[in-house]
């Protein structure tokens, strides 16, 4: 047999669909059926083929029904709704021969569903994935929000452009202990850490990082994408080691700080600029901006001095505030 025929025959043992573009393999024995979602939609015809050399005595069942769905090596089903998805199993004489799990990916009015994640609306509308980098090392963190707490599975893949999918490695998604309140509702926060393997911090980026997150809730499949340059998601850690030094014969103090440990080096090349503000109980003083790591301010009783940082030469996001008490 010709090698190409072998490949086609092997695939036909697993699953056939018409049209073939409407169904694809997510992982071994798990398939996504793409459906146009509207009233009286015809759905997709899916032909399941039992992965066995056996020919006779085969029956089919589904976890959605207690009845025998059919007999023979193949089973043809019409997938229109979630009740038609789920796990299909072929048996012979009480023995399980193979299983196939069908998930649904909905498209309404030409738009793929985004029901699983919450739109964070930052830095723009339809921002389901929020990615940040603390420096230019190629390491970044992406997070997302969901109101769903059970039957969830996430998988994240990333690359620099679409030419080399091995260029960026992402770990497993983890549930944060932090709950996020938005629109009068609490959401679970998930994060994932990614690292570009051959990152050069000083090099100009020509291709963006591409991130694809696949989400499965019960029998629903969705995917979310984000594309960015590392320079556009930079958010430094706050300055560290804030210190106050009283000035002689003056109501002012000198506040000093250091670059965060996580920031790229050398600092002479990767420079930060800083914002300093005195925050009292009832008001906030005017902000002071400096490229130095110290500043002179008037420190009122019961006030705090706070400092934040961002990239000096590229308008990155400002860091969170670091603060020290005046008292």
From Swiss-Prot:
Domain spans labelled Fibronectin type-III: 238-327
Protein name as it appears in the record: Interleukin-12 subunit beta
PANTHER family, per the entry: INTERLEUKIN-12 SUBUNIT BETA, INTERLEUKIN-12 SUBUNIT BETA-RELATED
Family: Belongs to the IL-12B family.
GO molecular function, one term: cytokine activity
UniProt domain Ig-like C2-type: residue ranges: 23-106
The organism of origin for this protein: Ovis aries (Sheep)
Keyword set includes Zinc: no
Extent of the signal sequence: 1-22
SMART domains: IGc2
Protein task: Cytokine that can act as a growth factor for activated T and NK cells, enhance the lytic activity of NK/lymphokine-activated killer cells, and stimulate the production of IFN-gamma by resting PBMC.
Main location, first listed in the record: secreted
Protein's cellular compartments: Secreted
Keywords, ordered alphabetically: Cytokine, Disulfide bond, Glycoprotein, Immunoglobulin domain, Secreted, Signal
């Amino acid at each position: 047999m010709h090698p190409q025929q072998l490949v086609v025959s092997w695939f036909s043992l697993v699953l056939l669909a018409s049209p073939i573009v409407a169904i694809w393999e997510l992982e071994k024995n798990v398939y996504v059926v793409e459906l146009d979602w509207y009233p009286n939609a015809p759905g997709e015809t899916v032909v399941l083929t039992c992965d066995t050399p056996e020919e006779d005595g085969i029956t089919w069942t589904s976890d959605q029904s207690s009845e025998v769905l059919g007999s023979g090596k193949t089973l043809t089903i019409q997938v229109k709704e979630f009740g038609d998805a789920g796990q299909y199993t072929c048996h012979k004489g009480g023995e399980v021969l193979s299983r196939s799990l069908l998930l649904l990916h909905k498209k309404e009015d030409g738009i793929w569903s985004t029901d699983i994640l919450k739109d964070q609306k930052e830095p723009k509308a339809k921002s389901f994935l929020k990615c940040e980098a603390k420096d230019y090392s190629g390491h970044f963190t992406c997070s997302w929000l969901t109101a769903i707490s059970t039957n969830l599975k996430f998988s994240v893949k990333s690359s620099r452009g679409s030419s080399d999918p091995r260029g960026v490695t992402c770990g497993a998604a983890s549930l944060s202990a932090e709950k996020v309140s938005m629109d009068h509702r609490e959401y679970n926060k998930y994060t994932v850490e990614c690292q570009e393997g051959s990152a050069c911090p000083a090099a100009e980026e020509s291709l963006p990082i591409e991130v694809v997150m696949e989400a499965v809730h019960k029998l629903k499949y969705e995917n979310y994408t984000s594309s960015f340059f590392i320079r556009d998601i930079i958010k430094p850690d706050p300055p560290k080691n804030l210190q106050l030094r009283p000035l002689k014969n003056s109501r002012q103090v000198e506040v000093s700080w250091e670059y965060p440990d996580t920031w790229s080096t050398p600092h002479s090349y990767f420079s930060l600029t800083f914002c300093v503000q005195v925050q009292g109980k009832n008001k906030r003083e005017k902000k002071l901006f400096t490229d130095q790591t110290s500043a002179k301010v008037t420190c009122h009783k019961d006030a705090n001095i706070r400092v934040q940082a961002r990239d000096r030469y590229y308008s990155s996001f400002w860091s969170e505030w670091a603060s020290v008490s005046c008292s």
